[in-house]
Design a protein with these regions (language model features):
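N-terminal beta1-alpha1 cap of cysteine-dependent amidohydrolase-like domains
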Residues: 1-188
């Protein structure tokens, strides 16, 4: 939360239940290489440290993403997962302009808006969703027909803005999207 460094217990338990060991990294660290060499994946959580108000958090995310891209480009698999605000950080960084004050837009998705996922064609063909469908078709159908996606954020990236950003489009594909209470479309995060 702006000015503090914490990880929600729910996030830690979720990661540990998946068999992962959690190593917290302070967002104000200057030991990026040291931490990077201690981990084999990166999770950028949701929370309250927005890029426009917490530059040190943004710079930490940017440095670790650059290290992850370099590792992957060198053939060393290094996964990165961004949840909600973490995904927002990843999109701002991938856009390449560091426009942390203006890149995100407001959405009316606060206060536990639960929705089904609307998959794009690329999303349905993605490795993540294709494998899920092949192992359990009812799982994917459930994601598309049941209110399973918790939307509890006021900021995001519209599908239109995502489409206009050439660098962002080269880096990521929208797998699914949702509409907020006012009908504004954003990529699911």
């Amino acid at each position: 939360v702006c000015g503090d460094s914490y990880i929600s217990t729910a996030h830690v338990l979720w990661l540990e239940d998946s068999g992962l060991e959690v190593i917290p990294i302070p967002y104000d660290t200057d030991r990026f290489e040291w931490y990077f060499n201690q981990i084999n994946g990166l999770y950028l959580p949701s929370g309250g440290a927005f890029a426009s108000t917490q530059k040190s958090y943004y710079n930490c995310c940017k440095t670790f993403l650059q290290l992850a891209v370099a590792a992957n480009n060198a053939g060393n698999y290094f996964p990165v997962w961004g949840g909600c605000m973490g995904m927002q950080q990843m999109m701002i960084i991938a856009d390449g302009r560091d426009d942390i004050e203006n890149f995100l837009e407001t959405f009316d998705s606060m206060h536990n808006l639960c929705l089904p996922l609307i998959f794009t064609d690329k999303g349905l063909k993605s490795k993540l969703m294709k494998n899920a469908y092949e192992s359990d078709p009812s799982f994917l159908i459930n994601l598309m027909t049941t209110d399973v996606s918790l939307n509890n954020h006021s900021m995001g990236v519209s599908r239109e803005k995502f489409t206009r950003s050439k660098l962002l489009n080269r880096t990521y594909d929208i797998i699914s999207y949702n509409y907020d209470r006012n009908g504004k479309q954003s990529g699911s995060h």
